């Protein structure tokens, strides 16, 4: 993938860029793997906003992705197409299995149309193949990693992300996360070899607020420019600093987003670097 820059023909085009979609080989998705997707605008079943800054955006259809890949062991599949997916930053690959079934997977870096991939403990160590962690050698770069055996891929699924398998000891494997955190995961969990493709996506300059609205992202308004009724930082004559430590609209201090007593915390060998004091 490469980035194509626009000429400054208007203020919105100045500095803006877009993917050239050179890796994409088909524009229409596989009809049998598409499901309707209804936008909720960040509202729950009661109509109340539970996630701010969401709403609008272009209509999308959901592509069903196979995140488990545990029921096709030993069955080879050919990469029929690399496709764009509006629901994620990575591209997706359409696989045609020898038994006639079709499935989507996240497209890793280097996977191209016509390649053959497979799943199972005896699969080769090459991009796109899916194996249990116990069958992957130490030092291998992987993505789409499960947290629980059979639970489906949860880690390293976005464009350009990857995890390094540092080693295995007993029934656990040590993984270095994209954040720098080192975490232990059951060796029965599956992972896909290689890093996620479309890494240049992070370098796109969106150019104007309207392109964010097309993606369903609404403006994020600072609390200090609101009225006192709307935010703890609101009000004051002229510009103010807010007058207190940063808090959410509901008065909770910023940061501290992790649950302190989460059961899986005992599997963290080394925490990510945050620039903050841990245990605040």
Swiss-Prot record:
Record's keyword terms, sorted: Ribonucleoprotein, Ribosomal protein, RNA-binding, rRNA-binding
Entry-linked Pfam families: Ribosomal_L2, Ribosomal_L2_C
GO molecular function (one): rRNA binding
Domain of life: Bacteria
Segments of skewed composition (Basic residues): 37-58, 268-280
Cellular component annotations (GO), alphabetically ordered: large ribosomal subunit
Coiled-coil intervals: none
The keyword Aminoacyl-tRNA synthetase is assigned to this record: no
SMART domains listed in its UniProt record: Ribosomal_L2, Ribosomal_L2_C
Gene Ontology BP terms: cytoplasmic translation
PANTHER family xrefs: LARGE RIBOSOMAL SUBUNIT PROTEIN UL2M (PTHR13691:SF5), RIBOSOMAL PROTEIN L2 (PTHR13691)
Known function: One of the primary rRNA binding proteins. Required for association of the 30S and 50S subunits to form the 70S ribosome, for tRNA binding and peptide bond formation. It has been suggested to have peptidyltransferase activity; this is somewhat controversial. Makes several contacts with the 16S rRNA in the 70S ribosome.
Protein family membership: Belongs to the universal ribosomal protein uL2 family.
Name of the featured protein: Large ribosomal subunit protein uL2
Species of provenance: Mycobacterium avium (strain 104)
Gene: rplB
